[in-house]
């Protein structure tokens, strides 16, 4: 094989990068479509799932603050999907924030929630409704890489859990995304008609 010049090397490298990005988009799109299918649900501890993601996503480059409700939060869920949703939210916060990320959880009556906050530029209220559409990225996202599918996948996963997503402003002025999940009523609780 003939020797590649330096320029060719750069070109090959950027082509490889493009291919990798295309593959990432295809993989995420398949995930996006797949999340619409029936998922086996089980009772699992939401805090344990959050803890796993925080441990996996924390490292020498990023530290994640946590404020998890004490004890377990038992929710009927597909744990792998919820883990994926939380991871996507954390990656989004890392991409657009300035280094501060906070993951918290809580519950009230018949629903539980988890939330991811960052200290990035935030998103204007009028843009928020588009945030979870595939391939839509906020203004501040234009300078960073990403498939534009991360939060669309989150939306699909939470929808499949009959949950709700709420967008707000974090305590540091960035973006806060809270996911609400229904908590099944246990036999010990009396349902009022």
Identify the meaning behind each predicted range:
Residues 118:
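Acidic ATP/Mg2+-coordinating residue in the GHKL
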Residues 100-110:
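Short beta-strand/loop element within the Bergerat-fold HATPase_c
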Residues 150, 154:
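Short alpha-helical Gxxx[C/S/T] motif in the catalytic ATP-binding
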Residues 63-74, 109:
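Conserved catalytic submotifs in the C-terminal HATPase_c
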């Amino acid at each position: 094989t003939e020797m590649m010049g330096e320029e060719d090397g750069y070109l090959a490298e950027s082509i490889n990068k493009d291919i990798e990005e295309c593959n990432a988009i295809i993989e995420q799109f398949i995930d996006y479509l797949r999340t619409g299918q029936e998922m086996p649900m089980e009772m699992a501890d939401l805090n344990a799932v959050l803890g796993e993601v925080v441990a996996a996503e924390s490292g020498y480059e990023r530290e994640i603050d946590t404020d998890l409700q004490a004890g377990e939060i038992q929710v009927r869920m597909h744990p792998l999907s919820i883990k994926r949703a939380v991871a996507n939210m954390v990656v989004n916060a890392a991409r657009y924030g300035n280094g501060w990320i906070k993951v918290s959880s809580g519950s009230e009556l018949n629903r539980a929630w988890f939330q991811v906050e960052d200290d990035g530029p935030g998103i204007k209220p009028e843009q928020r409704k588009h945030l979870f559409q595939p391939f839509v990225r906020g203004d501040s996202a234009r300078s960073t890489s990403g498939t534009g599918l991360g939060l669309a996948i989150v939306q699909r996963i939470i929808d499949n859990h009959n949950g709700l997503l709420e967008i707000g402003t974090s305590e540091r002025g960035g973006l806060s995304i809270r996911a609400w999940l229904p908590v099944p009523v246990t036999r010990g609780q009396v349902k009022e008609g």
